[in-house]
């Protein structure tokens, strides 16, 4: 029996990324739970879970040799998980770095945008790429709303890492 992988490069690299996230999750959660308590544990679990979901959905979408409705479902999941990863990446920043009312407000805003984005992808997977890109980028840069508090709370290197990540993803 011959197995056909639709897009081997993407399938393999995304599978490797998913497995790396899976293997990194346990030690990170143990460290977060022991050193920092439940809120850090939860934030890290959501972040790592979002990474596993994104790379798992993407590896599956690029692997399966399907057509028609089945392929369309996997494509929707692949695209929807981008919103989950962006929101999942915000979760530790909101819960750990910002905390309090500001952190929870930003968290609700980001996950709200993610929910709308996932709904758009579920209902309109053929939307123009520019439309999706605008939502992804806007969601990624919503942190400028809390630029001041982030700058006060984070060390300069941590802030520069956060800023660099935003620039690279944009």
Stretches with model-predicted labels:
Residues 1-170:
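Multi-pass alpha-helical transmembrane bundles in non-GPCR membrane proteins
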């Amino acid at each position: 029996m011959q197995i056909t992988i639709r897009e081997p490069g993407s399938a393999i690299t995304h599978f490797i990324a998913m497995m790396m996230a899976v293997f990194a999750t346990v030690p990170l959660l143990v460290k977060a739970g022991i050193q920092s308590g439940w809120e850090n544990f939860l934030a890290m679990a959501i972040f790592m879970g979002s990474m596993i979901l994104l790379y798992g959905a993407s590896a599956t979408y690029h692997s399966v040799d399907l057509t028609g409705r089945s392929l369309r479902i996997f494509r929707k999941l692949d695209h929807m998980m981008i919103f989950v990863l962006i929101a999942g990446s915000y979760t530790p920043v909101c819960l750990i770095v910002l905390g309090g009312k500001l952190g929870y407000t930003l968290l609700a805003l980001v996950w709200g945008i993610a929910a709308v984005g996932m709904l758009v992808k579920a209902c309109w997977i053929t939307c123009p790429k520019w439309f999706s890109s605008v939502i992804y980028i806007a969601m990624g840069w919503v942190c400028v709303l809390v630029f001041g508090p982030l700058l006060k709370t984070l060390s300069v290197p941590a802030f520069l890492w956060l800023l660099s990540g935003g620039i690279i993803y944009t």
